[in-house]
Amino acid sequence: YGVGIAFHDVNTLSVDVPDSIRAHFVSSQRIVLDRLAGRGCKMLIEPNGNKAYVAAAEGYDPIQTIFLQSGGEKLRPFAVNGDLLRTRIERGLWLPAAIPAVIEAQMARPVEEREAVNIGVHGTDRFWSEMLLWLNNTYGRDGEDCLWMPAAEEYFEYNYLRHHAVVNARVTENTLTLTVEMPGGLYFYYPSLTINLLGVDPGACTAVGGGETVTGLSWGRGRTADDGAEALMVNFDCRHALVAHAEHFVAVYEADPSAANRADARYFVAMLKDSDCKERLLKRIK
């Protein structure tokens, strides 16, 4: 339901033999493609610091980027120059109580020097819930509202599209029309972008719409990270599965109208662009 996927541990006893690990990448990929209706795996999250997995991944073309526990590049989102293909990126592992200090230390640095806080977690408990609540209240919707929390796969695709998408603009009277070409790679799943329109007064914008390929759409007032210049921020998503996800969770709510199921249904419906379909789904969960 929109989450990222990646290779991690594979089912081999030969955990130090790259050829065996690679063979299991191939067999695991077949299972993933079958179970996820054609969606494939293109990332490796290195398990237990085992560099044999890295060697195996470098001989398996579908794996396009690797996240390491140590020895990788530090990801600085405001200083990324390329599309991160075949890049080794370092991730972090912290207990939830330590994460706020890690985040605050990065926020104190100049924008271009800030490292992404890449958090690995194998299970959750009350301490994780408390940390996530702090994150929301400080930097999320109920705080500064400057937080983005993508999976590694989603960030990789977003950065790839930032570097390779082609945006064409056309102005007709009071209407700005954007045509965006987004080239995808092998097993890409997240055809979505945010476009910051400088020189456009957000207060003067009365409506934003998208064509048939756009399934999710939102817009609002934003500012650039470097100099704080005001911009009209347009977020759009072309995932065909967005509508199917929304319909699924609305049906789950109708079968069992609990508060939790209602929250799930509203969450997925809210992702959709304004449309007759969205209105029909909202009426089913009011």
What are these regions (language model features)?
Residues 1-54, 61, 71-88, 114-115, ...:
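Metal-dependent polysaccharide deacetylase catalytic core of the NodB/CE4 family, i.e.
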Residues 20-23, 27, 31, 52, ...:
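Extracytoplasmic/secreted proteins, especially bacterial periplasmic and envelope-associated proteins
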Residues 29, 33, 54, 58, ...:
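Non-transmembrane alpha-helical segments in soluble domains
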Residues 30-37, 108-111, 136-140, 270-274:
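Sec-exported extracytoplasmic/periplasmic mature domains
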Residues 62-79, 104, 111, 116-194, ...:
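C-terminal domain-boundary segment and adjacent tail
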Residues 92-109, 125:
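A Trp-anchored, charged/polar loop motif used as the substrate-binding/catalytic surface
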Residues 186, 218-244:
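C-terminal beta-strand-rich structural cap/linker in extracellular carbohydrate-active enzymes
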Residues 239-286:
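Beta-rich interaction/scaffold domains
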